[in-house]
Amino acid sequence: MGILYSEPICQAAYQNDFGQVWRWVKEDSSYANVQDGFNGDTPLICACRRGHVRIVSFLLRRNANVNLKNQKERTCLHYAVKKKFTFIDYLLIILLMPVLLIGYFLMVSKTKQNEALVRMLLDAGVEVNATDCYGCTALHYACEMKNQSLIPLLLEARADPTIKNKHGESSLDIARRLKFSQIELMLRKAL
């Protein structure tokens, strides 16, 4: 089921209902930046939570503010980086892997889609070093998730690997603690 939102446009963005998102923004362009009364999510954050690239692209063309934060002080970039495969994605990958590597291609396709989403947000001017209520940046989360495809994108956008979260850990510290040596090397090169 997922999350239920009090703002219809947020629910539509979360559920990938492009028609509804389009209708709400057409009615009033300020709906592109409306914040849900429950958790402060914007339609852009809702779409990024689920990786809905088409809706994100549409909202960005309608001047959605990429730097608005929700109650956890997270931007859309935090959620785009934290986006994981769904249970259904994993199930399809496992079931289709033996069939001409279709599962592998599905996995690669989903990963590329997430990279495109993050690149879109970076190109739109999202603050790459924005911290959430835990003091974590998108780079912290990318390191925790061992996301070797997003880390170079974030570093290229000038993500700071030395920012410490509220636990006193930088992205580099996280990579070191989790023994992600390739990520640690990437971060060291960025210093």
Swiss-Prot record:
Q: Where are the ANK repeats?
A: 39-68, 72-100, 101-130, 134-163
Superkingdom of origin organism: Eukaryota
Q: Which Pfam families match?
A: Ank_2 (PF12796)
Per its UniProt record, what InterPro entries does this chain match? Answer: Ankyrin_rpt, Ankyrin_rpt-contain_sf, ANR22
The UniProt keywords, alphabetically, are: ANK repeat, Repeat
Q: Which SMART domains match?
A: ANK
Q: What is this protein called?
A: Ankyrin repeat domain-containing protein 22
Native source species: Homo sapiens
